[in-house]
Amino acid sequence: MKHEDPVARLERVMRTVTAIVARPVRQFLTAASNHFASDCLLHSELARVLMADVGIEARTVVGFAAWRLGPGDGDVIMHVPRNPDALPTQQEVLFHTWLELDFLIADITTYQLRFKAESMDTADGGHTSVRWCPDFIVVRRGTVRSLEAVRDGHLVGQAYYCAASGAFQHKIKNGFELDPEDVEIARHLMINPVAGVVGRNHVMGVPHAPALLRTHNEAAKAHQ
């Protein structure tokens, strides 16, 4: 009997678990997040708790990230401050969060990249080509590209992740607490894939919320 490589096995398990927890978190926050597309810490912490429920002890990491969405010069989303060594202030709090387990990085917010690109285009009048917008990603830390490679290259689907200093991470995480009701809703959606959810974003017309909810509901019906 051929034994599976431990590294490959951990990556496979992490990818499976990430898919399981990403769906309910995405479904819930698309409907109800007060700061949709600026809520990475909430995404990561909810996912961390759900992973712990199934025995995966990942940790939330605060840092900086960039994603290459298309081949054009401007087809990049970057969450990188001008001075990554400076502590965050009220005037500039530019960061991203994701989950890490051993050598693996899991980001369940990448489904928001299209929305972020469209928001950026609305603000600056540009046009960002979005050829890559996965529901989530799981990558080995050693395969993450440099900021320069993502920013200046043209290979679609490349991502950059870099953890911030301990002091920076502490300042971002300090005082953040999950609402127990949010956790229970996410847990309910995880164990009940056919359950639907309608929240403030759906009612108030936040871009993409209705379409994303329809997608989630169609996926749920497929399980029936």
Identify the role of each PLM range:
Residues 1-224:
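A structural boundary/capping signal
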